[in-house]
Amino acid sequence: MTIMKKRVRKRLSPVQLIAAGFFILILFGGSLLTLPFFSRSGESTHFIDALFTATSAVCVTGLTTLNTAEHWNSAGQFLIMTLIEIGGLGFMMIPILFFAIAKKKISFSMRIVLKEALNLEEMSGVIKLMIYILKFAVVIQVIGAVALSVVFIPEFGWAKGIWFSIFHAVSSFCNAGFDLLGDSLLADQTNVYLIMVVSALIIAGGLGFIVWRDILSYHRVKKITLHSKVALSVTALLLIGGFILFLITERNGLTLVKGTFTERLANTFFMSVTPRTAGYYSIDYLQMSHAGLILTMFLMYIGGTSGSTAGGLKTTTLGILLIQMHAMFKGKTRAEAFGRTIRQAAVLRALTLFFVTLSLCVVAIMVLSVTETIPKTSGIEYIAFEVFSAFGTVGLTMGLTPDLTLIGKLVIISLMYIGRVGIMTVVFSLLVKANRAEANYKYPEESIMLG
């Protein structure tokens, strides 16, 4: 058995191990959720619905075909929370935790896989970073649970209040969007404190662990990496820019929120936060303006930062594209920012990611427009919203998910998986000779007319 495991590990590349690991975790979680033990009714759950829930949990999305509060009992909800935690932090955290407890040395091959899982340039310090991520995640989620308990314990009592606080702290930090309230934060849209606590947890989880390490260690090293500078800049741009645009398109939530000016302001800010990629909602998206829906879809498509609990195209990818565009407009060929030159390979990768992921979403919209029924009161945005939500692992919905056909469910499952694992990881895992070296010769160059 040990020899067979070693052979499998040798045959699989690091990216294939990551893709396979998430896939196996989803299948395992989905199989468990079919058991009568986890449902309130005591009956078995249909495999596709269980698989959909497991995929949504592991890929920290939040889209569900079954109501989490009504269908699953406490054991089922705990299993979903566990899948969210493992999926959010990365399944490779499990062996790291066991190795740390047992005080055993981690193999070189596992270090390579960890490097790929975190999208790191080099392998030095990868174990220290993983342990740091674990500690940071635990501390933030504990603080979040305590902050949420101020709301949930008075409302639901000690036992249920503590459980709700823990579940929603984990779901918020991991940008999952699963809720036990039945209708997300819609009934609590006037609770500014709750909205701001959830917003803080979402931002903390979506910002990226490497960025947080740079921020928290700045007082010692007085240095922030280019990755963190780009991530922080784009995150601020999207949060502030999104907030201002939602103020305009939704008139500060005048038609969406029944509350005071401050309460509407908090909800407008939340509209900018939650598409990045949490899935909690405090307003009815069916009532949102078309301009607001387009902005929400854009934010869902971009998602969070690389090396975080979020999905989507990623803020750093958008940052590189914007920097390259700025360079082109100034007549330069090199992408430069913060006194550094971005590698050409990174620019090409960003362009590839943008084209491939957007094409994937367009194809998915076309497929679902054939297989699904669009209400007479809605248009193609009804399907497009769900597609971008799934790819960005967001979890916001206009109501399509519960009524998906079998093909529709499989399409959304695939989008959630690709959005979490990464399109490049999925593609490279399917290529047998993905790491084949470039030929040592070069063809003659020739220009092509553009624009």
Curated annotation (Swiss-Prot):
Disruption phenotype: Mutants are defective in potassium accumulation at high pH and lack KtrII activity. Disruption does not affect Na(+)-ATPase activity. GO terms for molecular function: potassium:chloride symporter activity. Keywords: Cell membrane, Ion transport, Membrane, Potassium, Potassium transport, Sodium, Sodium transport, Transmembrane, Transmembrane helix, Transport. Its main location: membrane. It is found in: Cell membrane. It is a multi-pass membrane protein. The chain crosses the membrane at residues 18-38, 46-66, 78-98, 133-153, 162-182, 192-212, 230-250, 293-313, 350-370, 380-400, 410-430. GO terms for cellular component: plasma membrane. One of its GO terms (biological process) is sodium ion transport. Mediates electrogenic transport of potassium as well as sodium. Acts probably as a potassium-sodium cotransporter. Major sodium reentry pathway at high pH values. Belongs to the TrkH potassium transport family. This is Potassium/sodium uptake protein NtpJ. It comes from Enterococcus hirae (strain ATCC 9790 / DSM 20160 / JCM 8729 / LMG 6399 / NBRC 3181 / NCIMB 6459 / NCDO 1258 / NCTC 12367 / WDCM 00089 / R).
